[in-house]
């Protein structure tokens, strides 16, 4: 438990839209524009089609959970992000919004500072046959599906063998 407390994480506010219209033809769009407080957007429906040709868009705000913006309400995030979406697709209107949600996660990603490797706790806990799968185990890689699969295989091998 103490080893986990040593690992500092960054939080994320995940804003998700279900829309009638998309904003891009791309799955992943990095944004390097000072008018946007986002690193980018992910339009999942450009990777995999959704029923009725609906569009699913994910907008992440990575920040420390102590940042004042982390405490803002859903309406604040709707207004700000919808403005961003309209900058990308001026034809988008509020009537195109089918659904919208804001989700906040305190432990989105570990902050890998100097000496991080030594902070990583063992996968096996003190409780027999209880293993923990955490993104800190991906180090030195970043979060990703392939890293999740690799960690799952490692744990399965420990359980089965």
Stretch-by-stretch model annotation:
Residues 12, 91-105:
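A short coil-to-beta-strand element that immediately follows conserved catalytic motifs
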């Amino acid at each position: 438990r103490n080893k986990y407390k040593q690992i500092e994480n960054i939080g994320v506010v995940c804003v998700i839209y279900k829309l009638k219209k998309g904003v891009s033809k791309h799955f992943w769009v990095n944004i390097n524009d000072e008018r946007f407080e986002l690193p980018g957007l992910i339009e999942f429906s450009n990777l995999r089609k959704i029923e009725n040709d609906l569009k699913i868009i994910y907008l992440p705000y990575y920040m420390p959970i102590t940042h004042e913006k982390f405490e803002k309400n859903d309406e604040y995030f709707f207004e700000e992000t919808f403005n961003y979406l309209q900058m990308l697709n001026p034809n988008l209107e509020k009537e195109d919004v089918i659904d919208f949600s804001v989700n906040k996660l305190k432990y989105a990603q570990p902050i890998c500072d100097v000496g991080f490797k030594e902070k990583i706790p063992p996968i096996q806990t003190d409780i027999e046959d209880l293993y923990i799968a955490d993104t800190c185990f991906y180090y030195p890689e970043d979060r990703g599906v392939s890293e999740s699969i690799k960690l799952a295989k490692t744990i399965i091998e420990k359980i089965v063998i």
